[in-house]
């Protein structure tokens, strides 16, 4: 009895613990997936802003934001399901795994490009000039009017007044004449007279920008995308691990409560006394006197006669009023005392 009570108490204590562990895992899964979804939205926003900032620089890493965002969305849905929870979480883990790989690659590409191919020194020194978009006729007028001035002044006027062809001074040569499109930020210090092998500062022109300040914004956006991709990389790994540990857990409190309630009526210390009293009621010959009530009747009801007479002539005795049962006498064969398959004891004189 003591052992059964101990087992019952331990099971009752383990049920809230298991349900608490399930709720804790579910809460942690929702927290990490929501956090990953927020980081994915930031990666997508910053990556698209960096990609669309210029026309010729499209290295913003927004692809991991799409993949990680979809995987985290599936994780949020799967964490709130019960029947199809495992399938949804497995799909979420697969997408998050691909998003982690994409975040790693994009972090390297964006970081290397921002560090190696964008030089902000000419921009901070105001040596880069913005060429607005004008018509071809205006550009020809600017070029023709600039021939009357000195070469250095002509270069500056061509750069500031959006000429299609400008002259950039060079150490080994007198001038270089590159062709510049409209809405372009051009840096002569980074343009080595068209020799792409000898370019020392990376990109020398940034097409389709509103001003040269957009290049500084692009630089900051690329580094922001790099940092966010690194954060998404580690957060995706943590999210996949948390979802992997939660996908096989199920709430077991209702089923265990039913089993505990069903086992209470079958406990030994409740059922044993009932069975014992039932058995003692129907099987109690040892607790009764050796003779039944039939043997304790008066001699007027049962006259004394030798047992041999009863055994010799059992059929010769005719019924008479003196041998009839009285109204207060119990029945001759009482089922509670003698079952049908047992023979009653012999009658005593």
Curated annotation (Swiss-Prot):
Segments of this protein annotated with the region Disordered: 301-329
Membrane topology reported for the UniProt record: Multi-pass membrane protein
Bias type Low complexity, positions: 316-329
Main subcellular location of this protein, as a coarse class: membrane
Signal peptide: none
UniProt keyword Transmembrane, yes or no: yes
Pfam family of the protein (one): FAM70
Assigned GO CC terms: membrane
Subcellular location: Membrane
Keywords recorded for this protein, A-Z: Membrane, Transmembrane, Transmembrane helix
Keyword Transmembrane helix among UniProt keywords: yes
Protein family per UniProt: Belongs to the TMEM255 family.
Protein's name according to its UniProt entry: Transmembrane protein 255A
């Amino acid at each position: 009895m003591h052992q059964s009570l101990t087992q019952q108490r331990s099971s009752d204590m383990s049920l809230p613990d298991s349900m608490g562990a399930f709720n804790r895992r579910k809460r942690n899964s929702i927290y990490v997936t929501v956090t990953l979804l927020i980081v994915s939205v930031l990666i997508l926003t910053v990556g698209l802003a960096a990609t669309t900032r210029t026309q010729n620089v499209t290295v913003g890493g927004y692809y991991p934001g799409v993949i990680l965002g979809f995987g985290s969305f599936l994780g949020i849905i799967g964490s709130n399901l019960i029947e199809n929870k495992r399938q949804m979480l497995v799909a979420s883990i697969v997408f998050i795994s691909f998003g982690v790989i994409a975040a790693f690659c994009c972090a390297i590409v964006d970081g290397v490009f921002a560090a190696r191919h964008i030089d902000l020194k000419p921009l901070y020194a105001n040596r880069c000039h913005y060429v607005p978009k004008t018509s071809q006729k205006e550009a020809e007028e600017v070029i023709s009017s600039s021939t009357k001035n000195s070469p250095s002044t002509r270069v500056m006027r061509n750069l500031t007044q959006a000429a299609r062809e400008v002259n950039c001074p060079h150490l080994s040569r007198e001038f270089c004449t590159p062709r510049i499109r409209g809405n372009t930020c051009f840096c002569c210090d980074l343009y080595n007279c068209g020799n792409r092998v000898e370019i020392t500062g990376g990109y020398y022109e940034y097409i389709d920008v509103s001003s040269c300040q957009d290049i500084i914004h692009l630089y900051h956006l690329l580094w922001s995308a790099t940092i966010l991709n690194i954060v998404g990389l580690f957060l995706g790994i943590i999210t996949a691990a948390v979802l992997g540990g939660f996908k096989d857990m199920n709430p077991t409190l209702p089923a265990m409560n039913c089993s505990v309630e069903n086992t209470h009526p079958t406990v030994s210390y409740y059922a044993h006394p009932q069975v014992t009293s039932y058995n003692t009621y129907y099987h109690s010959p040892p607790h009764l006197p050796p003779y039944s009530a039939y043997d304790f009747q008066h001699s007027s009801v049962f006259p004394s006669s030798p047992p041999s007479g009863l055994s010799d002539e059992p059929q010769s005795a005719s019924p008479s009023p003196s041998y009839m049962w009285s109204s207060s006498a119990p029945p001759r064969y009482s089922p509670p005392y003698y079952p049908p398959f047992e023979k009653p004891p012999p009658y005593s004189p």
